Regions:
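N-terminal alpha-helical interaction blocks
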Residues: 11-166
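Extended, helix-rich structural scaffolds rather than catalytic motifs
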Residues: 278-281
């Protein structure tokens, strides 16, 4: 097959930025006060995307029947041993996360050096597995810097696994306020219609249907209040019984799906306002 000659060379097309990265950039332009937080988030998200391209799609050696049975027993679907972590990649990602947080002054020099030492520790796999199991219990973290770094390090591994599992089994009958995938607490919620709320795990980004009138922390159904912000795009459900709150995005009013990194940064001022009233994130 022949093609007609071209008079001039065509300029190469610019590759479009991924939606999440473009939305973060637009957020910083619209709200310059959020630019430092956006810059940090863009570095984290870019590193995650690069790692996930190298890792490919994970495979969990468990049948759909076994997954359904676990849900019925109230057990989380992803145990640490099933993830098959690539430890050289994990250690590299941990170093990258620590370096990013240090550049943005989230960590001081001493803390960064300590966390780099942990990343080189031969006992790192046991440390991470213990963190994974303790995070499912929802208790206070003894070492918040390590907890934050491990959460960011494991996220590209865990979110991809959660995506795969969520395609294989429905979690809509899961009755708990903790994630059916990894057992952690919700970090956000999605409102698709009035009274219909899906919680979104703060650790693996797994989703599950949960009663919009019930607090996922204490399961109280008569002490919740809901506030709207940003013209109703965001909502905050606060519980007067346990003093916890969960943020949500109304996807119809937003005109787009939840973008976890974008919406987390976009609602930082909302977090501060709710915390000033004595509430803590779930």
């Amino acid at each position: 097959m022949s093609y007609p000659p071209r008079d001039r060379a065509e300029a190469p097309r610019e590759r479009a930025e991924p939606r999440e990265m473009a939305a973060l950039k637009a957020l910083a332009e619209a709200q310059p006060e959020l630019a430092p937080a956006v810059a940090l988030e863009r570095e984290i998200v870019d590193g995650e995307r690069r790692l996930q391209r190298r890792l490919g799609t994970p495979w969990l050696d468990v049948s759909n029947d076994d997954l359904t049975a676990r849900l019925a027993r109230g057990e989380r679907l992803i145990e640490w041993a099933q993830l098959g972590i690539d430890w050289p990649e994990f250690r590299l990602r941990l170093r990258q996360v620590v370096d990013v947080l240090r550049r943005h002054d989230i960590l001081d020099a001493a803390d960064a050096a300590r966390l780099h030492d942990i990343g080189r520790d031969p006992g790192l796999p046991a440390i991470v597995e213990r963190w994974y199991d303790e995070g499912a219990h929802g208790g206070p973290a003894a070492d918040t810097s390590l907890t934050d770094v491990l959460g960011l390090t494991v996220r590209p591994f865990l979110t991809r696994a959660a995506e795969v599992v969520q395609q294989r089994v429905s979690t809509d009958t899961w009755p708990r306020g903790t994630c059916p995938m990894c057992g952690a607490r919700p970090g956000f919620a999605v409102v698709a219609a009035p009274g219909v709320r899906h919680l979104v795990c703060g650790r693996c980004h797994g989703r599950w249907l949960f009663d919009a009138r019930t607090c996922p922390r204490c399961l109280s159904s008569d002490r919740q209040r809901v506030f709207s912000a940003h013209d109703g795009v965001y909502q905050v459900a606060v519980c007067d019984a346990c003093k916890r709150y969960v943020k949500a995005i109304d996807v119809k009013k937003a005109g787009r799906p939840l973008l976890m990194s974008v919406d987390t940064v976009a609602t930082l001022a909302l977090d501060q306002a709710i915390a000033a009233q004595g509430f803590e994130a779930d």
